Amino acid sequence: MKTGKPDNPKNPESLLFPPILPPTKPVPQTGDDPYIFLYGGLLAAALIGGSVFAVYYFKKGKYSRTSLKRTAVGVSVLSLCVLVALGSGFLVFRDLNQYAESKDAYRDLAGYVEVPEQTASPESAPDPTEPKRDDTDIVLPSVDFETLRENGPDIIGWLSLPDTVLNYPVTQTDNNEYYLNHLYDGTYNKVGCLFADYENQADFSDRNTIIYGHNMRDGSMFALLNRYDEQSYFDAHRQMYLVTPKGGYVMEIFAAFAAKPEESGSETSPWQLSWKDDGAYTTWLTAMKERSAVESDVTVTCSDKVLTLSTCTPGGTGRFLVMGKLVKVDNEI
């Protein structure tokens, strides 16, 4: 509630009492590390440059007093090239090794998760007034959460997109930074892990639950989300599956679009977590659907719960989001 005249630019009190704006929470940086290309470029430049200098200065075999200074320069440059090659080579190896380690780590979870080989989508969208449905043609992944949590105690769910590499655990901790560079078991790794916003409820009961994940160049994690700006890809992948310790859900995708992290904190932010009433939530849902880069026949109302998947756009400056409503699947997991 505004009091006095703090908003009047002619009032000197406005300098002392500026308008109070809602806090803006930073959106996690979920792009892949761009420096592997720099490391690779330095390695190539060092190897090529070193080879050129080696041939130019030592092939002639001139080591007289008059050429001593020139030879010293050549040795110095060659030594620098060797050092750069060793350093950049190590960094390239480190990054590639982390890719391999992450793949091995997630492959180790295969024994705790049984993903059906064949899945089918329902022929038509469900009645939006019906919170549950009995879909005998939908077979969710079977997840042994008890054993899974022995390896990753912060795991709260499992997200999968049939017939793709997107098949990962979802974690959550008390911040949005830790799992940007740690695997589900706490191992440091730049690939990180999918994780829910720390302000969300762990049971996915909020109106909007956000899951963040990296856009990795090797195609892992949330890399394929950026393909949802293509209508053909969306048409072939309209649903994802979310399994939790308390049940399973179908994520029926209704919107996919790019956004700027600066939008966080605004009324139309896709990362919004709370609304003052049903009307505000309905307005937000409509705005999200209107922003979509693809056409979807999925309807959303104020009674629906939304799952928002957030990753970086290529280049890392923007964000790409895929949004869907969660529909409880009323069958055995």
Language-model features: where?
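Gram-positive cell-envelope targeting signals
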Residues: 1-129, 312, 332
